[in-house]
């Protein structure tokens, strides 16, 4: 492992933080980010770092403090505030206590913060405080786990690190672990040995130093030694050169899994969870190992990963060329997995004589030979984190198997972390948004009504695929979203008149989110002309392709996924007032939109047996790009109106905005008992009232 600490980078980094940030905190931030941006060291909020210094208080003068990573911070992006200052001496005084409960410990941490609004310090703060070094770094490096997740981990680590090793047998994070580490460190010094690294059995690595550089460099050195040992232990494996064939289309497996989990209640929301597939060469090669199922059933590489991946994955076995039986097979194996989890929960509660609130029993990681790793989460972030963690778990498992035998923490120890009192306290239900868990695909999403609808669906909690034929518009639309919405959005370029491009857009949705639930088929054009003219007939043909046939391309592709998921779905079409009350010289548009209205109704009839709803929004006179290039002026002139008067010519005398139309689509997306319906969004037009 290469060090990424560069002396030349430090001063500019500190200058960017500003003079108000103490130098020691700036240095702490610099090396914390170096650790956090290397996934072979820590992943997604894992690990923690600290630095000890002095702060000036208006009341107490100089106060010794420890800057320690706060809960919710990610080392990769941590800011100075992510290391809140805590009074050091009161924490060290806690060593005199024989024991301390988790909530009592957290209370001590919070009451000793210098800033009451700061994040809660890490649960491993006391371990950092009890060690004498100025800087302390804690990581869960893959290579370290490969050597300490062993039956003889201590012996292996002593061969690697010699007298510099402080070995600490497994203890769950908290007060007891802090005490044990401090005692082991002091005993090492008392024996006349110089501590270099602390390895926590089946947990991870602690390094330390008087400077940020020294502590960081010790991490890199310790991990490099471990990597070298794993490499020297690697077995020679003869690969066939080809991977196992997928039992069926990977997309079918993804859709069927998502639908199964939705049906069984595997998602915290009513819709299916987000499913992300990883099919790297490393993942597929691991799944081809004859012992892959056994290895994956052993447990998490480090205890806190259980909070993201459950104790074990589901190793899914599917028959080849049995597409009809895929969903039934997946459902049976998911039910079996849940039964095993329920038994584990009951066994652990009984053996420990504790009462806990049971978490859902559904898998977060599903392994399918020939298909890959399927990670499950309530959100894309959750699924991505689980996938990242398990990809690195595979590296740890294979490294540990090369070194000796993969032997991480026991099921009993995993249960203690999974059902930790501090985690149980977080189970208060938060109010979900109307479309939480839903995946929506919106066409024509680069501007106008489509863009507004995508934004509204995201606001309501959905994950959204934005589709448009203009890449620049899509990029701008996504960049304009807030951070929360942007994390649940993806985009892809497609011309919806091209069925192959439409299929590719839906494949993108499957790769990004695992499937789709809601389709807003919005893309279209607004050609004008007389049908009895040669130009009008040509425009009619073009309009039928763009405003009718293209919508069927979208609906057909959606229906394939809806049927494979088996959980219903929602088709929404942007029709138009022109479908029921055509205007003069607007035939190419009105005829195609009338056909689209009939298309919506036909899908309402034909798709109902699959639980699929089909509805439409009839909007009128919304000032979007369709009214550009003189169209608005021409339509207003036909009626003898100014452009502004034209857009307000309705019963309410109110201009209809794209957000108004988006609100109608959002309502229909959640209207579970409504199909074959038209909602008008036109400010009121008696001639266009649905009959």
Language-model segments: what does each one mean?
Residues 513, 654-681, 686:
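C-terminal substrate-recognition "lid" of short-chain dehydrogenase/reductases
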Residues 525, 536-552, 572, 596, ...:
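Catalytic Tyr-X3-Lys loop
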Residues 526-541, 564, 585-588:
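Conserved mid-core segment of classical short-chain dehydrogenase/reductases
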Residues 576:
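Residue(s) in the substrate-gating loop at a strand-loop-helix junction
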Residues 608, 613, 673-677:
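Short, small/polar-rich loop/turn modules that mediate ligand/substrate recognition or access, typified
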């Amino acid at each position: 492992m290469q060090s990424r600490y560069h002396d030349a980078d430090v001063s500019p980094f500190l200058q960017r933080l500003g003079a108000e940030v103490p130098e020691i905190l700036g240095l702490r931030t610099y090396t914390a980010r170096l650790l956090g941006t290397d996934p072979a060291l820590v992943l997604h909020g894992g690990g923690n770092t600290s630095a000890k210094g002095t702060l000036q208080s208006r009341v107490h003068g100089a106060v010794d403090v420890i800057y320690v990573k706060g809960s919710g911070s990610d080392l990769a992006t941590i800011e100075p505030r992510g290391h809140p200052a805590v009074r050091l001496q009161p924490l060290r005084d806690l060593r005199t206590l024989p024991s301390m409960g988790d909530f009592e410990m957290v209370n001590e941490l919070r009451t000793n913060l210098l800033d009451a609004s700061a994040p809660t310090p890490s649960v491993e703060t006391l371990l950092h405080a009890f060690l004498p070094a100025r800087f302390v770094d804690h990581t869960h490096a893959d290579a370290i786990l490969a050597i300490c997740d062993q039956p003889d981990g201590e012996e292996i680590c002593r061969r690697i690190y010699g007298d510099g090793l402080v070995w600490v047998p497994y203890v769950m994070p908290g007060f007891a672990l802090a005490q044990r580490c401090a005692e082991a460190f002091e005993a090492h010094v008392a024996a006349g040995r110089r501590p270099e690294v602390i390895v926590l059995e089946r947990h991870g690595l602690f390094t330390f130093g008087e400077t940020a550089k020294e502590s960081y460099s010790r991490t890199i050195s310790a991990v490099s030694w471990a990597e070298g040992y794993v490499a020297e232990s690697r077995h020679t494996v003869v690969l066939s050169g080809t991977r196992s064939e997928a039992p069926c289309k990977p997309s079918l497996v993804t859709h069927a899994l998502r639908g199964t989990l939705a049906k069984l209640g595997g998602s915290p929301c009513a819709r299916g969870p987000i499913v992300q597939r990883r099919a790297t060469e490393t993942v597929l090669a691991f799944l081809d190992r004859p012992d892959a199922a056994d290895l994956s059933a052993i447990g998490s590489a480090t205890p806190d990963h259980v909070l993201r991946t459950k104790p074990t994955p589901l190793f899914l076995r599917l028959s080849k060329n049995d597409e009809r039986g895929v969903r039934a097979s997946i459902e049976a194996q998911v039910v079996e997995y849940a039964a095993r989890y329920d038994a584990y929960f009951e066994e652990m509660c009984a053996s420990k004589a504790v009462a806990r609130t049971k978490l859902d029993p559904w898998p977060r990681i599903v392994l399918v030979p020939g298909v890959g790793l399927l990670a499950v989460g309530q959100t894309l972030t959750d699924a991505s984190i689980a996938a990242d963690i398990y990809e690195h778990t595979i590296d740890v498992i294979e490294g540990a198997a090369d070194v000796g035998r993969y032997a991480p923490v026991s099921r009993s120890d995993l249960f203690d972390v999974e059902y930790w009192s501090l985690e149980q306290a977080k189970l208060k239900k938060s109010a979900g948004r109307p479309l939480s868990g839903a995946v929506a695909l919106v066409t024509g999403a680069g501007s106008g009504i489509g863009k507004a609808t995508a934004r509204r669906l995201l606001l309501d909690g959905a994950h959204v695929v934005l589709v448009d034929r203009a890449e620049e518009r899509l990029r701008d639309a996504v960049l304009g979203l807030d951070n929360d919405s942007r994390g649940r959005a993806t985009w892809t370029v497609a011309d919806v008149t091209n069925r192959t491009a439409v299929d590719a857009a839906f494949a993108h949705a499957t790769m990004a989110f695992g499937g789709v639930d809601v389709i807003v088929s919005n893309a279209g054009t607004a050609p004008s002309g007389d049908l009895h003219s040669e130009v009008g007939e040509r425009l009619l043909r073009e309009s039928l392709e763009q405003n009718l046939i293209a919508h069927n391309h979208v609906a057909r592709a959606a229906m394939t996924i809806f049927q494979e998921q088996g959980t219903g779905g929602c088709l929404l079409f942007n029709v138009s007032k022109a479908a029921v009350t055509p205007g003069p010289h607007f035939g190419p548009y009105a005829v195609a939109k009338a056909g689209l209205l009939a298309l919506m109704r036909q899908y309402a009839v034909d798709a109902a047996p699959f639980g699929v709803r089909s509805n439409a929004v009839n909007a009128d006179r919304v000032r979007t790009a369709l009214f550009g290039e003189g169209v608005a002026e021409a339509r207003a002139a036909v009626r003898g109106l100014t452009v502004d008067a034209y857009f307000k010519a309705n019963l309410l005398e109110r201009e209809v905005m794209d957000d108004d139309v988006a609100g109608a689509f959002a309502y229909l997306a959640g209207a579970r008992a409504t199909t074959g319906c038209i909602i008008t969004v036109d400010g009121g037009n008696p001639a266009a009232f649905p009959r």
